[in-house]
Amino acid sequence: MRHRIAIAAALAATLLGAAACGGSDDTGANDTSAQALDGKGKTIKVWLMVDAQSAWKEVVEDANARFTAATGANVTVEYQQWANHLTKLDATLAGNDVPDVVELGNTEMPKYVFSGAFAELDKSRFENSANWLQGLSGPCELDGKTYCVPYYAGARVLIYRTDLFEAAGLKPPTSYAEVIAAADALKAKNGSSKKFAAFYMPGAYWYAAMSWVHAEGGQIAKKDGDKWVGTLSEPQAQAGLQKWADLVKNYSAGDVTKDENDHAAIFAQGESAMLYGHGWEVGATQEQRKDPNDPNSALVPTKVKGKVASAPMPGIPSFLGGSDLGVASKSQNQALAAEWIKYFTDTKSQEALLAKAVLPNATNLLDKAAAVKGNEATALAAKSSWFVPMAEKWADVEKASVLQQMLRDIVTGKKSVADAAAWGDAEIAKTLNG
């Protein structure tokens, strides 16, 4: 494989080594030496994931305003759902009416860079580029050239109801055994409601399930010679899957076939005590749009406003992921698209994101991230992390929902852990080696 994709250990080391990193000498979004772009009468189309709409829409709007003031061009932002965005992107890229800017997860980006879906970018034009996190910038680079720009990183944490913990005489758990003990106590105290979940865990939440797998020493797949083999059938991986499935069975509630896309909204209904989610979802559980179908409607407090906090999930390593932004090769507005990315990823935008409990795209900003109230748990969670297999076709595994289907088969009882893992291994190997 020609991609230089940073491994999880390198990303963790990058995060932990922030104090040793200096500032950037790169040309920034306020560079006045660059020739001004005239975008009057033009509109660029930006595809961002729904996270930005629900958690930091004001950051998007600020970048749009600064971009329009500088170029005269307008911006149309279309928010995408994680569940189907790759299928939609593939279909769109096959035609000519393509988005100018596309957000992809850092595990998804390599396939599209390798296939030529994104245009080459001048790395020096983006602020803090000398200090980009390797786990985000690695998937952007091919043969010494840059094809996307790091957007943000994040780690998952334990989100919990402070009022329910206090009523049960509990403190934030510091070991996995304490997590289970807390779940038992909360279930005993609040279990009269069939809707109550001591620990809400969607059954198709593969980022969570694979974290439990890694906690037991397992992994998803490994390279054997020149072939990939699935490793979910190995004893450690099965132990992690079983431990996770037991959590779902004993402490969750509701439709076990769901994924995590709306778990913050479900937690906000007030019937759950614990959740495993992004640091920024602490805020998403407490304020939501008055009209869920109108992203411009006012934010209103939920039932759990002021009753939610976060802590590192003890004993469970976090998937340390994030997103990158690319300019479509078929875009007719490549210069303007790159300019928009410049504003959306500059220091002003990144510092605004810190308040949302996400990690910035550059090491020189990490000290500021750790100092932001509410970001402490996310920064600590990043110290124990894992990453997906470094396979060029990994995005195809995600697109086919292989892990989600395997997990649904387990939690619905359709298959045993052993049988589901064997099926998953076969599908993963077939996809990665195809």
Where do the model's predicted regions map?
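C-terminal capping/gating helix-and-loop segments adjacent to ligand/active sites or protein-protein/ligand interfaces
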Residues: 356-360, 377-427
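A structural signal for short loop-to-beta-strand junctions that line the ligand-binding cleft
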Residues: 99-100, 128-164, 197, 308-317, ...
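Glycine-centered hinge/linker elements that transmit conformational signals in sensory
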Residues: 183, 227-256
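Short, solvent-exposed loop/beta-turn-alpha elements that line the ligand-binding surface or hinge
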Residues: 38-40, 123-134, 191-192, 197-199, ...
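Extracytoplasmic/periplasmic solute-binding protein
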Residues: 147-150, 156, 180-229, 265, ...
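Conserved N-terminal structural module of periplasmic/extracytoplasmic solute-binding proteins
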Residues: 2-12, 18-111, 123-128, 256, ...
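Hinge/lid segment of periplasmic solute-binding proteins
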Residues: 38, 106-155, 180, 215, ...
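Extracytoplasmic/periplasmic substrate-binding proteins
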Residues: 49, 109, 242-332
